[in-house]
Curated annotation (Swiss-Prot):
Predominant location: cytoplasm
Gene Ontology terms describing biological process: ERAD pathway; response to unfolded protein; stress granule disassembly
General function of this protein: Plays an important role in endoplasmic reticulum-associated degradation (ERAD) that mediates ubiquitin-dependent degradation of misfolded endoplasmic reticulum proteins. By controlling the steady-state expression of the IGF1R receptor, indirectly regulates the insulin-like growth factor receptor signaling pathway. Involved in inhibition of lipid droplet degradation by binding to phospholipase PNPL2 and inhibiting its activity by promoting dissociation of PNPL2 from its endogenous activator, ABHD5 which inhibits the rate of triacylglycerol hydrolysis.
Protein name stated in the entry: FAS-associated factor 2
UBA domain sequence ranges: 12-48
Protein localization: Cytoplasm; Lipid droplet; Endoplasmic reticulum
GO CC annotations, alphabetized: endoplasmic reticulum; lipid droplet
Organism: Bos taurus
Stretches the record annotates as Disordered: 299-361
Residues modified to N-acetylalanine: A2
Residues bearing PTM N6-acetyllysine: K167
Domain UBX: 357-439
Pfam families in UniProt: FAF1, UBA_8, UBX
Quaternary structure note: Identified in a complex that contains SEL1L, OS9, FAF2/UBXD8, UBE2J1/UBC6E and AUP1. Interacts with YOD1. Interacts (via N-terminus) with UBQLN2 (via C-terminus). Interacts with PNPLA2 and UBAC2. Interacts with ZFAND2B; probably through VCP. Interacts with LMBR1L.
């Protein structure tokens, strides 16, 4: 059953919670979760912020002060290797040791009292981290000025960034905390850390992060790792999905001994990295497979959607076509109906046909486009428009036509035009008592 602090958490958040607790040493799971939630589960920002919360210094992300960061150094799973300073040998050595003992005691006592009193006058500037990367670069430059440029490759980034890179790359992270005032620091850096075989091992097998405890960034990491003496080295790696301190090396260690201890720690914990690497590969393969399945599903979905879209477009095209045909049919019906009504109206408005005995009458024989003939009498005084209206009212006549005379061959102006605003009468048009006129179909023109 999950702990109360881990309820309602995703797997990724649970892993970050456990990793944050392991790196900071905070025993309360509630406090760890609260801190991570304040930083939106950004573990790098949370760890860096915890390193800033020392002795009343405000947090960058959380203004209320908090207790100093702690690391559980009593974990029996952490491999520890401590090199003690050699005891004096012989009468001369013991004599020198006894003579110097009071001076050393007095010196360190006065130094501690001075530092303690100074804390009340001026807060320790190391409590405020303003430029963590600048602290690393500054330490590297001072290291090279003092011990030369032949040294392991320094990680130029914050402690939290180094942790994240080691986790992402599944590599060991070796952390070195430099005590400037310690008597063994110079000898360790010059003879051990800068030894060619040590440089080769560190550069090829792990990331190397180092800083002086006199720098704010180094001091914060020192508060987290809680070294007992200097020189101090801590080996950190991803273990059980958490960045974990798996080895601590303290004291003046010689190059061969350092290589043996680092190799032992790596060999003892290599299986965790191999296991994590296999799990990552499996997760990546699962993710790739899921992505391929999702892509195949999306491709199939897009294909189905495209088919459905084409079907809809085809249905819409057919619907519009049918609607267009129907509209055309209705329009044609309306046109024919209007035409028929117009024919009937023209027929009703025609003047009576003159009698054959009327000397002012004209007998006209019309030859229609279908070769049929129609005969009717008109009065000389009537307009040519009457002839057009008569032909228009006939069922056999075309919808649009013109009337032509044969001798001489000409088109009769039966309808108003620019040349003939008022069509002439039959007499004015020069028609005789008997005429044959031809009806020419203009419907398709």
């Amino acid at each position: 059953m999950a702990a109360p602090e881990e309820r309602d958490l995703t797997q990724e958040q649970t892993e970050k919670l456990l990793q944050f607790q392991d790196l900071t040493g905070i025993e309360s799971m509630d406090q760890c979760r609260h801190t991570l939630e304040q930083h939106n589960w950004n573990i790098e920002a949370a760890v860096q912020d915890r390193l800033n919360e020392q002795e009343g210094v405000p947090s960058v992300f959380n203004p209320p002060p908090s207790r100093p960061l702690q690391v559980n150094t009593a974990d029996h799973r952490i491999y520890s290797y401590v090199v003690s300073r050699p005891q004096p040998r012989g009468l001369l050595g013991w004599g020198y040791y006894l003579i110097m003992l009071p001076f050393r005691f007095t010196y360190y006592t006065i130094l501690d009292i001075f530092r303690f009193a100074l804390r009340f006058i001026r807060p320790d500037p190391r409590n405020r981290v303003t430029d963590p990367v600048g602290d690393i670069v500054s330490f590297m430059h001072s290291f090279e000025e003092k011990y030369g440029r032949a040294h392991p490759v320094f990680y130029l980034g914050t402690y939290s960034q180094a942790l994240n890179d080691a986790k992402r790359e599944l590599r060991f992270l070796l952390v070195y905390l430099h005590g400037d005032d310690h008597q063994d620091s110079d000898e360790f850096c010059r003879n051990t850390l800068c030894a060619p075989e040590v440089i080769s091992l560190i550069n090829t097998r792990m990331l190397f992060w180092a800083c002086s405890t006199n720098k704010p960034e180094g001091y914060r990491v020192s508060q987290a790792l809680r070294e007992n003496t200097y020189p101090f080295l801590a080996m950190i790696m991803l273990k059980d999905r958490r960045m974990t301190v798996v080895g601590r090396l303290e004291g003046l260690i010689q190059p061969d001994d350092l290589i043996n201890q680092l190799t032992f720690i790596m060999d003892a914990n290599q299986t965790y990295l191999v296991s994590e690497r296999l799990e990552r590969e499996e997760r990546n393969q699962t993710q790739v497979l899921r992505q391929q399945q999702d892509e195949a599903y999306l491709a199939s979905l897009r294909a189905d959607q495209e088919k459905e879209r084409k079907k809809r477009e085809e249905r819409e095209r057919k619907r519009r076509k049918e609607e267009e045909v129907q509209q055309q049919k209705l329009a044609e019906e309306r046109r024919r109906r209007n035409l028929q009504e117009e024919k009937e109206r023209k027929l009703e408005c025609l003047p009576p046909e003159p009698s054959p005995d009327d000397p002012e009458s004209v007998k006209i024989i019309f030859k229609l486009p279908n070769d049929s003939r129609v005969e009717r009498r008109f009065h000389f005084s009537q307009s040519l428009t009457v002839i057009h209206d008569f032909l228009f009212s006939l069922k056999e006549s075309p919808e649009k036509f013109q009337i032509e005379a044969n001798f001489p061959r000409r088109v009769l102006p039966c309808l108003p035009s620019e040349e003939w605003p008022n069509p002439p009468t039959l007499q004015e048009a020069g028609l005789s008592h008997t005429e044959v006129l031809f009806v020419q179909d203009l419907t398709d023109e």
